Amino acid sequence: MEEPVTVYSFEVWDQQQGAYIAQRLKSPAARIERIAKARIIVGTAEEVDAAALDPHGRYNPLP
């Protein structure tokens, strides 16, 4: 079992819609910070096993 990591739901600005759009997958804060115009949705923190992240550092909260 790998170390736990905290992942968050987040939203990304969609220029065409003129609004932030929530993303289905969760990510660690460090990954979200690298995405242009993305912001963490407060209160969505979840601790998961690092092995549950995909190769891009994303976590699918739905089985």
Residue ranges of each PLM-predicted region?
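Acidic surface patches and DE-rich sequence motifs
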Residues: 14-15, 54
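Short, mixed-charge low-complexity intrinsically disordered segments
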Residues: 31-63
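A short beta-strand micro-motif
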Residues: 6-14
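A short, exposed loop/beta-hairpin motif centered on an aromatic-Gly-Thr core
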Residues: 17-30
